[in-house]
Regions:
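RNA pseudouridine synthases
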Residues: 2-326
Length: 326
């Protein structure tokens, strides 16, 4: 059911020179800047009685604002008592270390049991923040650090920081193949043309940039540290598959087990039982959305990746005399 919302306000003199969408986000803090921008583009905002349809247009101060919109009532997700590993919290943000097998947001096939449901239980006021404060996501079986906004102003500023590439996200991963050097993958990503749940490199996709460097070599695998410039769905997984080095365990993008020649039964078993993409969000750095202070968090790789890497090291040591690139 749609709800009619009518809002009025006057731009203050202190807002002189601000963008229209920025000024309105301050005047109407109960609504996100992205939603206000949609209203502007939909010509639902009147500035001194005339349609204001340019989000980047500057305000002078003193303008009378009138907004008349209908808002579809959002689906009501239920709070659920799901444990969250919280590594930092203040009045404005949460940083969590997400485990494997946990979806971030409800969707097709996952109506509940998500990070969002857990947030609603842990901090009920977050229900008033768009998407319960979730500003970026990790795949279901990717582990590691995520920041969540507890208030609308914090959410607005974090979204802006992501768009401006001011938030640094670094990952650890294990890729298939012997990689000789680090590098950058700069290839656009879009939905796969025939597989609805897959992504793919495509010339008409959205820009995507992934930087990577080598941390450790194994016989036919490589441990990597990666940094995202952009945050497309499945970005690291798609980019590494595109350069023929899919992540270990990533059966969607070609990471099925490939034991090296002469591998022990123990190592073959370790590879086969690792049933998720070997990817962990290990570092998060950002400017606090309210105080502006630079903050940084680290999360060590989880036990399943520790055991995988230890098995690869043992295999490497057992066969290093036979490796021709040493």
């Amino acid at each position: 059911m749609a709800q009619r919302v009518q809002l009025t306000a006057t731009v203050t003199e202190n807002q002189l020179g601000q963008r229209l969408d920025q000024a309105l986000a301050e005047l109407f803090p109960d609504y996100s800047r992205s939603r206000i921008k949609e209203w502007i583009l939909d010509q639902r905002v009147l500035v001194n009685g005339s349609i204001g349809d340019k989000p980047k247009g500057k305000v002078l101060g003193g303008e009378h604002i009138a907004i008349d919109v209908e808002i579809e009532e959002e689906a009501r997700f239920q709070p659920q008592d799901i444990p969250l590993n919280i590594v930092y919290e203040d009045d404005d943000i949460l940083v969590i270390n997400k485990p494997r097998d946990l979806v971030v947001h409800p969707g097709a096939g996952n109506p509940d049991g998500t990070v969002l449901n857990a947030l609603l239980h842990y901090y009920p006021p977050i229900a008033d923040v768009p998407r319960a404060g979730i500003v970026h996501r990790l795949d279901k079986d990717t582990t590691g650090l995520m920041v969540v906004a507890k208030t609308i102003p914090a959410q607005t500023r974090l979204v802006e920081s992501l768009q401006l590439r001011e938030i640094t996200r670094e990952y650890e991963a294990v890729a298939i193949g012997h990689m000789t050097s680090g590098g950058t993958v700069e290839e656009p990503i879009s939905r796969h043309p025939t597989k609805r749940t897959h992504m793919a490199v495509h010339p008409m996709g959205k820009p995507a940039v992934t930087h990577y460097r080598i941390m450790e070599h194994f016989r036919i695998h490589t441990r990597l540290r990666l940094r995202l410039e952009t945050g497309r769905t499945h970005q690291i997984r798609v980019h590494m598959s595109h350069i023929t080095h899919p992540l270990v365990g990533d059966q969607v993008y070609g990471g099925r087990p490939r034991p090296p020649k002469g591998a022990s039964e123990e190592f073959i078993t370790a590879l086969r039982k690792f049933d998720r993409q070997a990817l962990h969000a290990t570092m998060l750095r950002l400017y606090h959305p309210i105080t502006g202070i630079e903050m940084e968090w680290h999360a060590p790789i989880p036990q399943d990746m520790v055991e995988l890497i230890e098995a690869m090291r043992a295999d490497f040591e057992a066969h290093k005399d036979d490796i021709d690139w040493l």
